[in-house]
Regions:
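Acidic-residue sensor for enzyme active/binding pockets
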Residues: 12, 43, 110
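Active-site neighborhoods of divalent-metal-dependent phosphate/nucleic-acid chemistry enzymes
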Residues: 46-51, 60, 71-118
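Residues at the C-termini of beta-strands that transition into short coil/loop
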Residues: 38-39, 81, 119, 134
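Residues that scaffold the ATP/ADP-binding catalytic core of kinase and kinase-like folds
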Residues: 12-13, 25, 47, 87-91, ...
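Short, well-structured N-terminal submotif of metal-dependent ribonuclease cores
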Residues: 1-40, 50-68, 125
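Acidic, PIN/NYN-like endoribonuclease modules and their adjacent C-terminal/linker elements
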Residues: 1, 105, 109-135
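General small-molecule cofactor/ligand-binding pocket signal
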Residues: 35, 78, 131
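Alpha-helix capping/helix-boundary segments
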Residues: 9, 40, 84, 103-104, ...
Length: 135
C-alpha cells in the first residue's frame, strides 16, 4: 500500500511530542510507501516565510527541516501533472472542494494513494481513500 501524507501529518512528525498514533503508524510503514505533494511543500514554505519577519531563528530551523524533507522524499514528491489537473477539474464540478484539498485528493486518486490526514471529512466527497493515524 502507498500513502500521500498531508501537511498536517508531515508537520506532526516534526513535533518533539508527536502524536503517538502518528508516530506508531509512520514507524509501521516502509519509507518508500510514503509520498508528499508539492502542495504540502508550498504550504510549509508559506509558513516559513510568515514566521521569518517575527522569528528569523525559528524560520531558519523550519527551512532546514524543509530542505531535509525535500532530500528525504526526493523521488517521492509528486508534482501536479496535467492528468492530476484534469482529474481535479472533473472532481470540482460534482464535489466542490478547496483548491489544495481538491488537488491533493486528485493526486491520491491519480496515483492510487491513500491520503493520510487528520481531516478525512475534507476529502470524503472526493472519493479518495483516507486514513487518520492520530490517537
Amino acid at each position: 500500500m502507498a500513502y500521500l501524507l498531508d501537511t498536517g501529518v508531515i508537520s506532526e512528525l516534526r513535533k518533539p511530542h508527536c502524536d503517538p498514533g502518528v508516530a506508531t503508524w509512520m514507524a509501521g510503514i516502509q519509507p518508500d510507501e510514503a509520498f508528499l505533494s508539492v502542495l504540502s511543500l508550498g504550504e510549509i514554505r508559506r509558513g516559513i516565510e510568515l514566521h521569518r519577519p517575527k522569528d528569523p531563528k525559528a524560520a531558519g530551523a523550519l527551512e532546514r527541516w524543509l530542505l531535509g524533507l525535500e532530500a528525504h522524499y526526493a523521488e517521492r514528491i509528486l508534482p501536479i501533472t496535467t492528468a492530476i489537473a484534469d482529474r481535479w477539474g472533473r472532481l470540482c464540478l460534482s464535489q466542490p472542494l478547496p483548491v489544495s484539498d481538491g488537488l491533493i485528493a486528485a493526486t491520491g486518486l491519480e496515483h492510487k494513494l491513500t491520503v493520510v490526514t487528520r481531516n478525512g471529512s475534507d476529502f470524503q466527497r472526493s472519493g479518495v481513500n483516507t486514513l487518520n493515524p492520530f490517537s
